[in-house]
Each structure stands twice: as structure tokens, then as C-alpha cells.
Amino acid sequence: MTTYIFDSTLDGLLTAVFDSFALHQQPQLLAEGEQLPLFADEPHRVVTDEEKAARVWKGLEKHLSREALRIISISWMSEERALNQPLFNYICKVFLTGKDISHNASDPDVLAVRNTCRRVLHEEQRMKQFIRFQKAKDGTYLAVVSPDHNVLPLIIDHFQDRFNDQSWLIYDARRHYGYYYCPPSESPVRITFEDEAAVPFSLTNGKLDADVLSTDDQLFQDLWRTYFKAICIRERINPRKQLNDMPRRYWRYMTEKN
């Protein structure tokens, strides 16, 4: 079987679709670094081309609804390697049939893309619920997260709508970037740090350094922990339900769990 290797970007995958039609091939798609199948022929290395990718996406816009395109975009934010082949197959089928196949739940590739999208949207909702801000002495609010999926672009509008009169930074410690908002700016700015070792907060638990943390915020954190413990009814503790509603992987950045 022919094998394509691409750079794990959406433009790279769309370029692979372009190449597969240009070369009349139905390849197995692998990300850079994945192991080649046994006895595989020399792989075709996809050179990401923005122009080719744009042509493929424009073609998708002619065949798919806006909602179907949104599902593709959101599913890609999962960053799951297992999605690469189903998404590649799905896009190829759209061009081969010339139809919108996005509602064909009996197609395994369509189903894989839709289910992946659901997982990403589920985590988007959890991020909105579980983000905890800390206030720095300069008045800026900081929240550190480390989601399984790359959901930061999906939640930024939510926080801009609610905190458009305050300065804040939401930082993804896993992907090493964040969004900073400072009124009266129209929109948050994506930022990265050249030296993460020098940032005034912990990437492990998200806590601001003591010399940066606002004095009143430390008080509010202590009050919140006290309240969290006080409302607990020991006879009704249900660890299984708590873990289902609030997975352990989010705890390290949550004030009430630190």
C-alpha cells in the first residue's frame, strides 16, 4: 500500500488530499514520526503547500454545509493521531461522490470525525466550568490550563464577553501558548513566552508566585477552600460521581483542590 507522511498540520492533511488525487492514489496517511508498516514501499512525503490546501478547502466549501465544515475544524483541534486517516478518507469521499456525506452516520469515517468533534466540544464546556483565575498585584487575572484537546481558541470569546472590562491571561501549559486580553482592546492577543522558566507562575499547578499574587486574592482563595469544605455533606460523598463530573486531570489547576 502507498504511504503518505505529513507534518500533522491541517494544511498538510489537505495537501495530502490534493496529492492523492493528482497522483491517483489511495494512500495510508501517517504523521511524521509514526512507524511505517512492515514491507511498506518508499513513502511519499507530503510537502505542505498553502495554495493546494486552500484549493481543497474551497472545494469542500462547495460540497459541505457550514456546520459540516465547522465539525471538521473542531475535530482537528483534538490533536488525535487516530483522526488523521478517517478525516483524510472523509474528505476524499466528499470529492469522489460530489455530495455532502456529513450526515451519513453509517460511514465509519464520518462517524469518527463527528465523535471526535463531540469530545472536543465536551472538553470546551468543561474548560468554561473548571477554569480558576488568580489576581496579580497589577490587577491582571491569570488562569493556567492543560486540556487534552486544543480548545483554547473555542473558549476565548466566552471569557471576553464576560470579562471585557478586566485584563486577563489564559495560558495552555501543555501547548505553551495563551491569550491575553487588556481593555479596551477589541480582541485577545495570542502570546507565547521565550523563556517559560522565567514566567511568574507555576506550569505544574498554575499558582502565581507569592510576590506577584494579590494579597486579597490569597484571602479569597482561602475563603473559597473553606466554603468548599463547609458545604460538603460527608454522608452524601460520592467519589465516582465526582470523578465523572469533575475528572481528576483538571484538579491540579483548581483552587478548591490545591
Q: Locations of the language-model features?
A:
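N-terminal ordered "arm"
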Residues: 1-51
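Short, charged/polar micro-motifs that form catalytic or ligand-binding hotspots
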Residues: 3-8, 42, 46, 103-106, ...
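Short, hydrophobic/amphipathic alpha-helical patches that form generic packing surfaces
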Residues: 12-23, 89-96, 157, 161, ...
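Charged, alpha-helical interface segments at or near domain boundaries
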Residues: 31-128
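Short, intrinsically disordered, low-complexity segments enriched in Ser/Thr and Pro
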Residues: 42-56, 182-215
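Short coil/turn segments at secondary-structure boundaries
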Residues: 70-75, 173, 236-243
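Internal, well-folded beta-alpha domain core
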Residues: 100-201
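Long, compositionally biased intrinsically disordered terminal regions
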Residues: 167, 179, 194-258
